[in-house]
Curated annotation (Swiss-Prot):
Membrane topology: Multi-pass membrane protein
Lineage of producing organism: Bacteria, Pseudomonadati, Pseudomonadota, Gammaproteobacteria, Pasteurellales
Similarity annotation: Belongs to the TRAP transporter small permease family.
Name of this protein: Putative TRAP transporter small permease protein HI_1030
GO terms for cellular component: plasma membrane
Membrane is among the record's keywords: yes
Transmembrane intervals: 13-33, 51-71, 86-106, 135-155
Amino acid sequence: MMRSLAHFINKALEILCISILALMSILVFLNVVLRYGFNSGISITEEISRYLFIWLAFLGAVLAFNENQHVSVTVLVNKLPPFGQAILKFITDMMMLICCYLIIEGSWIQFQLNLNNFAPISGLPQGLTYFASVIAGILVSAILITRLISTIFFIFRGEVK
């Protein structure tokens, strides 16, 4: 059940990222054609593309984190025995969970502060850019919590992956 929910969320994020990238590409291409071909443009596309890019970066980071595609230095980890690797994984996941809390807290404050500041052309609240990091922080925290539970389970059962 939990694995299928995680798979569903992962697929939904992939589809959302693909959709955001496609929409961004269309908006930017349309604006370039209008500017250079017809000497006019749609000014709102720049703001919307910026907002979409921010959301794409944060949601893409969640996808990369979920699939262990982020950069990591494993020189020390690979030399440890499996139990030591599990302990180190637990410690690093706990530290990342603390960082996620700080990101969520700071981004939530910025979201609230900037909710009444509006973009000049589109009129969208500028707090939406900070809300992307809140959502990303929550999703990464959920991934970390499931990893921590799995690591604890394997450490205490003596079955270390």
